[in-house]
Structure formats: structure tokens, C-alpha cells
């Protein structure tokens, strides 16, 4: 019983992977990273629908065995190297684990690369973001 209590205490003390942002904190951080202001509402919409603004999310396995990582749910078959060592084109040149941290710099840079090569439709949730977008006007 003591061992169980110790294990529970250790599990609770262990730092959680990632963090949860909100629309405004995401918009401000992305703006500070140089993302054009006219894109910020779209990125906020995508992050809301892909991960609920959570940086530590690994999505369920896709039909082809790949997974999606981080706040923008970036796919490990094309864009990042999975921890399993499975083949990846790794177009962003980074480990998928880099997309799960509190620092969103890698996620933002990789997402911008996805956008430049495939457009907004690279995200399956884009149809939620093609009309009304969340306002970021009060965020700055």
C-alpha cells in the first residue's frame, strides 16, 4: 500500500508534457515570432479545432499508421521524425517531440512550412476556419 501511495505521489509530482494556451496567448506568441497579423485568427481557429490549444497532444493513429503532433497536429509521416524511428520525410527537420513542448517556436515554424507548401487545406479542420474566425482584436 505504501508503494502505491508513493507511486501516486510521484505521478502527481511529475511535470505534465505541454501546456494549454488560449486564443489570445497563442496570437501574441505567434505575433512575437513574426507570423503575419492577418493570419493569426486562422491559426487560432486551427489550434482550437485540432488540439484545443494544447501543445502536448499526440493524435490517434491515422489510417496510414502516422500520428499528428502538437498544437497544430502536424503529421509525422511528412513533417517530423517520430520517436519510434519509423520512416518520415521530416520536411521540418525536427523530432516530433519538439512539437510537444511548452515553447511553440518549432510548432509555429513547421506549421508555416506546411502552409507554404500545402495551403490551409492541409489541416482537415480547415473547413471550420474558412468562414467566421475568432476575433483576436482584443488580444493586443
UniProtKB/Swiss-Prot annotation:
One of its GO terms (biological process) is defense response to Gram-negative bacterium. It comes from the Eukaryota. Its EC number is 3.2.1.17. Keywords: Antimicrobial, Bacteriolytic enzyme, Disulfide bond, Glycosidase, Hydrolase, Signal. InterPro entries: Glyco_hydro_22 (IPR001916), Glyco_hydro_22_CS (IPR019799), Glyco_hydro_22_lys (IPR000974), Lysozyme-like_dom_sf (IPR023346). GO terms for molecular function: lysozyme activity. Found in the midgut. Residues 1-18 form the signal peptide. It catalyses: Hydrolysis of (1->4)-beta-linkages between N-acetylmuramic acid and N-acetyl-D-glucosamine residues in a peptidoglycan and between N-acetyl-D-glucosamine residues in chitodextrins. Disulfide bonds join 24-139, 45-129, 80-96, 92-110. The keyword Isomerase does not apply. The keyword Hydrolase applies. Unlikely to play an active role in the humoral immune defense. May have a function in the digestion of bacteria in the food. Belongs to the glycosyl hydrolase 22 family. This is Lysozyme E. It comes from Drosophila melanogaster (Fruit fly). The lineage of its organism: Eukaryota, Metazoa, Ecdysozoa, Arthropoda, Hexapoda. The gene is LysE.
Amino acid at each position: 500500500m505504501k508503494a502505491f501511495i508513493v507511486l501516486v505521489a510521484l505521478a502527481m509530482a511529475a511535470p505534465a508534457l505541454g501546456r494549454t494556451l488560449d486564443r489570445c496567448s497563442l496570437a501574441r506568441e505567434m505575433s512575437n515570432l513574426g507570423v503575419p497579423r492577418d493570419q493569426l485568427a486562422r491559426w487560432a481557429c486551427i489550434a482550437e479545432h485540432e488540439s484545443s490549444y494544447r501543445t502536448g497532444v499526440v493524435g490517434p493513429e491515422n489510417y496510414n499508421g502516422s500520428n499528428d503532433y502538437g498544437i497544430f497536429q502536424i503529421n509525422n509521416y511528412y513533417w517530423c521524425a517520430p520517436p519510434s524511428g519509423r520512416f518520415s520525410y521530416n520536411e521540418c527537420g525536427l523530432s516530433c517531440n519538439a512539437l510537444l513542448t511548452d515553447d511553440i517556436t518549432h510548432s509555429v515554424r513547421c506549421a508555416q512550412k506546411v502552409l507554404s507548401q500545402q495551403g490551409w487545406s492541409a489541416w482537415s479542420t480547415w473547413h471550420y476556419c474558412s468562414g467566421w474566425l475568432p476575433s483576436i482584436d482584443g488580444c493586443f
